[in-house]
Amino acid sequence: MLTLPFDESVVMPESQMCRKFARQCEDQKQIKKPESFPKQVVLRGKSIKRAPGEETEKEEEEEDREEEDENGLSRRRGLRKKKTTKLRLERVKFRRQEANARERNRMHGLNDALDNLRKVVPCYSKTQKLSKIETLRLAKNYIWALSEILRIGKRPDLLTFVQNLCKGLSQPTTNLVAGCLQLNARSFLMGQGGEAAHHTRSPYSTFYPPYHSPELATPPGHGTLDNSKSMKPYNYCSAYESFYESTSPECASPQFEGPLSPPPINYNGIFSLKQEETLDYGKNYNYGMHYCAVPPRGPLGQGAMFRLPTDSHFPYDLHLRSQSLTMQDELNAVFHN
């Protein structure tokens, strides 16, 4: 089977008149194209007047495009810094001034609108000026409170109205709003229920126990706190018992009721020592000598009994009263030997 190559001339034969006419039109178009383009460019150049700044920019772009390499091909160039000419610097400066003027006008308009809003909201003061964010928050709360009044159709209570106005506001703004509406700020805080108890409670009440005593009054500087827990007497001698072999059973902090016998001697509030008989002085003097930190030089036993003169100075100006002075000479001999 013979096959012929596909040819448009064979499938669709054209007449001689159409063929000649089409070829003549194509020849005229090819001739007219290069002539029409420069004419349009010339006409555009005559009709449109360009600014000097735009002409310089166009010339710079054309110079960049016309740069060619040695072979005649255009070179690909990356970002390059434009020439800082005097005209370019003036143009940049003019644009910056225009942007600054637009921003200044915008801020002036915003400040004027906020001033008008401050006159409308129920918080106007000649001495104190609300900040921008506080003004916007108060205006939002005011619009919401008025919409709630219109929705319910009843006149609300003054306290609830102020509470709705002051949601999310700072404390100075809240006080200012309450003062403008002739409402005491303290009663406003007390009317908030659980929040009032939280504000009036001292932050130190969780760390320190309440102070209570049946005999002593409340010390100055302490408020009337919860008296359910009474102050317990603490035994301070337990910390010193590890330093001695025999602990003193009488070394304990006294109760606030106080004994009827002669009062005990207080070691500057650390612990107390009651007056004992002459037979028990061995324990107390051994305890007192260790407290004074006076090292004995002689061969003294642990159970040695001696007495101290009243003129010897103990720490914290302690003087033992009503003690016998029968062994004063023996004590002096022990220390000087």
Curated annotation (Swiss-Prot):
GO terms for cellular component: nucleus. The keyword Transferase does not apply. Residues 28-80 are annotated as: Disordered. GO terms for biological process: cell differentiation; dentate gyrus development; positive regulation of transcription by RNA polymerase II. GO terms for molecular function: DNA-binding transcription activator activity, RNA polymerase II-specific; protein dimerization activity; RNA polymerase II cis-regulatory region sequence-specific DNA binding. Residues 54-71 have a biased composition (Acidic residues). The keyword Glycosyltransferase does not apply. Keywords: Activator, Developmental protein, Differentiation, DNA-binding, Neurogenesis, Nucleus, Transcription, Transcription regulation. Specific to the nervous system of both embryos and adults. Highest levels in the cortical plate of the cerebrum. It is found in: Nucleus. Its main location: nucleus. Residues 94-146 form the bHLH domain. It comes from the Eukaryota. A motif (Nuclear localization signal) lies at residues 80-86. Efficient DNA binding requires dimerization with another bHLH protein. Activates E box-dependent transcription in collaboration with TCF3/E47. May be a trans-acting factor involved in the development and maintenance of the mammalian nervous system. Transactivates the promoter of its own gene. This is Neurogenic differentiation factor 6.
